[in-house]
C-alpha cells in the first residue's frame, strides 16, 4: 500500500513497470540518427550532422570497438553518406564532403562530384583531410588543380600520399581493403572529434 496516495500496487504490476523501464532505452544511436533525419529535412544541416555523428558514435562506442565500427559503417554510414555529404557541402566544408563522397560506392560519381567541388572551392580545401583520401583519381585531380595554382605545400602533401605504397591500386585486395577500412575508421574519429567537441 502506498501510504501517500493510498494506492495499492500488487507485485505483478511492479514487475510490469520494471520490465517497461527496461524496454525504453534512449541511448540507442538509431534514435539520434532519426532526429538527424528530421533536422536534415528541415534544412538544419549543422544539427543534422551532429546527430548523425553522435548516433553513429554511440553505435560504435565512439569508434573504439572495431567490430561495431565495421557493422555501423555498413549499416548506417554507407546509407547516410549522401546526407552527410550534403551537410558538409552546405556547411562550406568542401574537403570533408570530398572524403565522404568516396563512400558513395560509384567511383565515376565520386569523381564527378568531387571535381566540381575542387574546381569551385580549391582555395578552401583543408589539408588535414588529404590523408583520408584513398581513391587515386581524386588525388590526381587534386594534384592537377594545385599544380595549376602553383601551391607547393599542397602539391608536396599530395605527392607524399600518392607515393605511399599501401595506397597502390595493384596491391592485393585484402591489403587495400584493410587500408580503406582503417582510413574510414580514422576519418570518422577525426570528424566526430572536430564536430562534436565544438
UniProtKB/Swiss-Prot annotation:
Q: Does the keyword Cell membrane apply?
A: no
State the compartments where it is located.
Nucleus; Chromosome
Q: Name one GO cellular component term.
A: chromosome
Q: Where does it primarily localize?
A: nucleus
The lineage's top-level taxon is: Eukaryota
A Gene Ontology BP annotation from the UniProt entry: RNA polymerase II transcription initiation surveillance
Chain ranges passing through the membrane: none
Query: What UniProt keywords apply to this chain's record, in alphabetical order?
Result: Chromosome, Nucleus
PANTHER family attached to this UniProt entry: INTEGRATOR COMPLEX SUBUNIT 8 (PTHR13350:SF1)
What family classification does the UniProt entry report for this protein?
Belongs to the Integrator subunit 8 family.
Note the subunit structure: Component of the Integrator complex. The core complex associates with protein phosphatase 2A subunits, to form the Integrator-PP2A (INTAC) complex.
**Record's function text:** Component of the integrator complex, a multiprotein complex that terminates RNA polymerase II (Pol II) transcription in the promoter-proximal region of genes.
Protein name per the record: Integrator complex subunit 8-like protein
